[in-house]
């Protein structure tokens, strides 16, 4: 079941809200929690019942391991350590076998059917890391053993199950624990705010990400024939597709959670406004980077053991992140290159701080001059960061190294209009029909192409305006005054946006991070 489907929006979500609110109104928090768990199982089993069985078995095993930590037998340090290593190997082993063995094994064996029957449950990477973090926190005695229902809800809570955000136990168990203890007064549902945020995310996915996907799919399938202009347009389109697809999903998950009175962490914080690549990765897929920072980077020593060790630790984080995304060489190169960029950014930032300290004792710069210089430097930094991100996307999206080479070589091929017109012609939307008819009558030779070009540049303008806005969707909804909610123009605008997005569901498309 997908968020962007008629069944989910018109049947599942209303049924969930009605049952959940009815139980909350009767102050039956534990029953509301059980109902939420059942609905989450239904949501997940809609992909395949065997997925739900796999998840249930993994949950029971991890919960059992957590319970063993409190027994007298595992109070001894070596036994406790053995239990932790065994549980970690169990989780990581299941992830490795299901996600990586088929691809790696097929390449080594040269047969595509050898590992075809291995199960790959949807969202495996997310709920495995979620439970791995919980077990590590239990081992380090940062978490107590929770009741079963709150723990089950923490793992299977459907808005975060398939594509994140990658929640941690310390931010979710207290909320589900309050429901379990029938403290329903602590749950503050916000139906209006949640619906608006869900609509914003829905529109991002349907009206922006899926439209940019048309140009992206054409560009990467035509990699040998592209030129500089078309390649840049394709890469920018892919950057926006990736962002609006994933942040759209996150906004929808945040909106659903807001309706239910459950708080989940944000996953994006205006990443395209980052002034360096290091800051970019602090703003993009924030919960995944938080996981790798807390459970990989810091245990390796973080930045406490000198410059070289810090650089190696950063590279390790990005290589692990690359492996999390997939086992192909393109992903490894993507992770390694991003790691090198972040190491260089870290070194330059450290050097810049030292230069500022040295200049502190010299002549003081005027406030206006300093502000102007910082503004110019910030703008240049944003452009550089965006361009670096675009280059790394070649590795992230390419199917193999041959396609990587084709795309890089196209950056040195200058023709006009080349494949650019063919690319924009993929943006053939039903909404353009009237405009195309008028344009053809006025300009028989070039009318349609002008409409396609106008569509592409309109999408680009809207995308740039959104990513460069001072507030993202969540901040916008959170800061809106109550009077705004009650205004008829605002309600009509949100309603039109929702209906327009719903009408765009001509074909259900999966979210990009579904495959991870």
Predicted regions and their residues:
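Membrane-embedded transmembrane alpha-helical bundles that form the catalytic cores
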Residues: 1-467, 471-515
